[in-house]
Every structure is written in structure tokens, then in C-alpha cells.
Amino acid sequence: KMMNSELFVFLDDVQFRKKGWQNRNRIRTNKGTALLSVPVHAHLYPNINKIVIDNDKNWSSKHKKSILYNYTPAPYFEEFKNSIEVLFEKKFECLIDLNTEIIKFVMNELEIKPKIIFSSDLKISQNGSDKVLGICKALNADYYVTGTSWAKSHLKIEDFKKSNITVKFQEFQHPIYTQIHGKFIPKMSVIDLLFNHGKKGTKEILQNSIVTSS
């Protein structure tokens, strides 16, 4: 969605989801895949921007070693090796700060330049579709780019139309691409694409996998 937007809103004042993708992702390995999770203190599952990382566990060093070890054979390993090392050597107290840093890394590598805003800064009290509409209004948006799975069943499209905001549905058609370690396995972290196809190749593959409709 960032590739089709001028402004990206990080929805950080919504509830953290246990076993979701807010603190974990998958990478390719010579044995198949590995799930890398960032340990967090999430008692009662507060909002994402309140989640504190459990840095007593040596997760950062382990994840860095796992990524570098498994992607050493990749064609573009040397291009991204240093950036990965720098990213995982930084210390983060809150999950939101880590996720923001990762997003900025990807944006920089793919030369995607939307402005980033945190929903918590807008102080929109509504929930669900009303919250999204409130955010769009606060930012004077002309259109809103969203995925299809949640939006088509929960978004109140008529409310957006009344506010002269066009909703654009973006469907991601998962690409099949050349991947190290054997047969292709889908739903990996974007770093899998970067290591295998570089900046230019990753951007082209992603652009060709997006279908947008109103």
C-alpha cells in the first residue's frame, strides 16, 4: 500500500494481537522456513504503541545471526548484509520503534517516499471503520488505499462516499519468484525478496503483484 500512497498511517493505537505479525515474520532457511519472533511484555494486550520489548532475552543477536547465516548464498547478500547488521545492533525499548525502523529501512531500499504519520498522534477516539474515516478526514484525504480481506466486510463505504473520499481496494497477488534453498515457499519477509532479487528486482516484482480497484 505504501507504493500507491502519498501518506502512510501507522495504526499504532489499536490492540496488539497475540500470534499476529506485529512482532514476528518468516525467513527462508535450508530446512524450509524459520519464524523470527520479538519477545514482548504484552500483559492484557495493550495498544501496539504501549508494547515493550523483552530485551532480557537475547533475541536480536540470534535473529541477526539466523538471517545472515541463511541468506549468505543469496545473490544480493553483500548488498544488504551491513544494513541488516546495523538494524539488529540497535537497541529498542518499544516494539513500535523497532517496527518503524524496519519500515523505514524497506522504504529507503525500495525508494518509496510517503510521509509516515502515527494514528495515535491524531487522537481519533472511534473504532473500526469510523476510526479509519476519522483519520482520513483529519488528514484531508481524497482517497484511502486498503486491502480487501478486512475492508470489504467491515468498511462502511457509504460513509466514505458521503465525505467525498474514494476507497481504493488493493489486492496483493502473491508472486512466485526465484528463491534460494530449493522450491519456492510463499509468505516470507520482504528481506527474502531483497536478498534474492535486489532493490530493482524487488520493486518490479511487488509492483507487478498489485491490483487496485475502486
Predicted regions and their residues:
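Residues lining hydrophobic/aromatic ligand-binding pockets adjacent to catalytic sites
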Residues: K1-S214
